Amino acid sequence: MSSARFDSSDRSAWYMGPVSRQEAQTRLQGQRHGMFLVRDSSTCPGDYVLSVSENSRVSHYIINSLPNRRFKIGDQEFDHLPALLEFYKIHYLDTTTLIEPAPRYPSPPMGSVSAPNLPTAEDNLEYVRTLYDFPGNDAEDLPFKKGEILVIIEKPEEQWWSARNKDGRVGMIPVPYVEKLVRSSPHGKHGNRNSNSYGIPEPAHAYAQPQTTTPLPAVSGSPGAAITPLPSTQNGPVFAKAIQKRVPCAYDKTALALEVGDIVKVTRMNINGQWEGEVNGRKGLFPFTHVKIFDPQNPDENE
C-alpha cells in the first residue's frame, strides 16, 4: 500500500468546490492510483462527492451530509471531512486508499508530455444559472434552456448581459431570466450551497460504493460461527424489514424512502450494496444496511 502524501486538515488542497462530474473525470483520468478530489454534489445540494483515480478508471463516491452535522460515505459516519479522508488513508475504497489530492488545475495524464503551467482566470469567472427558457429575439441574443450554466463576459446594460454557453457561443441574455452562482471559498464552512452546486445532475446509480468495513453478523454469538448466506431472488420473493429510517435527497428519483418497520420486497441484490426493492407500490434503490432479511426459520426474530 502506498503511503498517503497529504494533510487532511488543509481543505484548500483537496476541496475543489462546485466542479462537475465531467471536470473531475478530466482531472483524474489517467492519473496515478489514489489521486483524488472532493467536490460539491450537483444532485443533492449540501452533499459532497469523493472522486478517485483507481483501477484505470475514475470512481465517484457520494458523501451525505447528515442532520447531526456528521458525514456519511457507504456505511461509515464521520464528524468532519478531514476525519473521513484520514480513514481512507488506511482503508481501501475499492482498489486503492487515498494517496494525494489532484492538482487544482488539471495535469496531463501519465506518459504524456507536460505543458508549461499557464495562468488561468477560472477563479475570476462569474457564472449564472438560467431560470427559464429564452429562445432569443434578435441575432445578437444567446438562446438557452432552463437550467443551463453560463459564463458572464460583460455587463453593458443593467438588464442585458453578454454571456457564453458551454459550446462557446456568445450573446446577450436578459438578467431577470438568470440567477448568480457564487463559487464557494476553499476555506468556507459547510453551509447553504444550493446556489453554487452547479453542473449536470448525477444519477444515484452512477455513484460507487466503498468497501464495507463492518463484519457480517454470525448465526450465533459463538466465535467462528458460519455466516448466514443471503437468499437468492431467483428462488422467489425475498422480504426484509426496514431497521433504519431513510429519507433520500429530494432530487434523487431512484432512491427508496424507508420507515422503520416497513416490509420491503427485495427484487435485486446488487454487489455494490445498493439493493432494489418495493414498498407499498414504491420502487427504488436502498442500502442493504437499512434492512434485515426475514428468516423463515426464526419468525420471532422478525419482531
Swiss-Prot record:
The modification Phosphotyrosine is found at Y127, Y207. Gene3D superfamilies: SH2 domain, SH3 Domains. Keywords: Phosphoprotein, Repeat, SH2 domain, SH3 domain. One of its GO terms (biological process) is postsynaptic specialization assembly. Residues 184-234 are annotated as: Disordered. GO terms for cellular component: cytoplasm; cytosol; extrinsic component of postsynaptic membrane; neuromuscular junction; nucleoplasm; protein-containing complex. It comes from the Eukaryota. GO terms for molecular function: cadherin binding; identical protein binding; phosphotyrosine residue binding; receptor tyrosine kinase binding; RNA binding; RNA polymerase II-specific DNA-binding transcription factor binding; signaling adaptor activity. Residues 123-183, 235-296 form the SH3 domain. Residues 14-102 form the SH2 domain. InterPro entries: CRK_SH3_C (IPR035458), CRK_SH3_N (IPR035457), SH2 (IPR000980), SH2_dom_sf (IPR036860), SH3-like_dom_sf (IPR036028), SH3_domain (IPR001452), Tyrosine-phos_adapter (IPR051184). Interacts with tyrosine-phosphorylated EPOR and INPP5D/SHIP1. Interacts with DOCK2 and DOCK5 via its first SH3 domain. Interacts with phosphorylated CBLB and IRS4. Interacts with BCAR1/CAS and NEDD9/HEF1. Belongs to the CRK family. May mediate the transduction of intracellular signals. This is Crk-like protein. It comes from Homo sapiens (Human).
